[in-house]
């Protein structure tokens, strides 16, 4: 399952074409719209609102099932010759004190924060990464190699932010999609081409933008969050160490 980046490259079929973040922010300011609003308008110019919403809901559904399966699987060792153990189920049991936080589906009071919220974000990302390594169903967000980051941050929003709701999830995905589109159009999201900065860096930038948006950030603040997300991944390669 792949998130759509169908705000067309030439912009010919959308009401708010943009090819850079400067252009995107200018559109937001001119039309008094959020980044998510801009992307929604562009997407619904090419297909029905019902179809766009259905596809976004499906992305979120697959992400949730992926995290849930990664945290509950009975498989103890990942396939392949390395005999790498799955760590997410034990980590989940420890953080949730052997209860089922994911099944109860809400919120901060249901979770035991043994160290920090970051431990839960780590868990969610690890669960997706292990599902990917085990041949499970994931969302390429934006790639297989970086598939854990966006679901992890989105699950943090869903489970630990008091005002989280379904509309916020849609806003998150639309905003993240705009950032991913700009990276794909102007640079690369391919680890084989530009190293891990192109995969993990892009995913980090997308997730930062999405979280900033659902926490009430302005388009300028969302842009800044996205920039900080990629800045600290620039130069990150995929070279093996050891």
Tell where the protein language model's regions lie, with residue ranges:
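Accessory "access/gating" subregions that flank catalytic or transport cores
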Residues: 46-195
């Amino acid at each position: 399952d792949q998130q759509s980046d169908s705000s067309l490259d030439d912009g010919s079929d959308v009401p708010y074409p943009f090819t850079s973040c400067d252009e995107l922010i200018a559109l937001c300011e001119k039309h008094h719209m959020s980044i998510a609003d801009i992307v929604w308008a562009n997407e619904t110019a090419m297909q029905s609102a019902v179809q766009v919403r259905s596809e976004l809901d499906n992305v979120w559904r697959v992400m949730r099932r992926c995290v849930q399966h990664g945290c509950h699987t009975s498989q103890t060792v990942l396939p392949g010759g390395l005999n790498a153990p799955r760590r997410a189920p034990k980590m989940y049991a420890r953080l949730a004190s052997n209860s089922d936080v994911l099944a109860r589906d809400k919120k901060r009071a249901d979770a035991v924060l043994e160290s920090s919220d970051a431990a839960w974000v780590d868990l969610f990302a690890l669960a997706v990464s292990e599902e990917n390594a085990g041949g499970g169903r994931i969302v390429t967000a934006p790639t297989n190699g970086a598939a854990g980051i966006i679901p992890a941050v989105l699950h943090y929003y869903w489970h630990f932010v008091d005002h989280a709701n379904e509309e916020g999830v849609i806003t998150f995905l639309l905003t993240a999609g705009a950032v991913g589109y700009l990276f794909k159009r102007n640079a690369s999201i391919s680890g084989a081409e530009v190293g891990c900065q192109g995969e993990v860096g892009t995913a980090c930038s997308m997730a930062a933008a999405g979280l900033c948006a659902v926490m009430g950030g302005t388009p300028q603040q969302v842009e800044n969050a996205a920039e900080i997300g990629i800045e600290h991944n620039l130069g990150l390669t995929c070279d093996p160490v050891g």
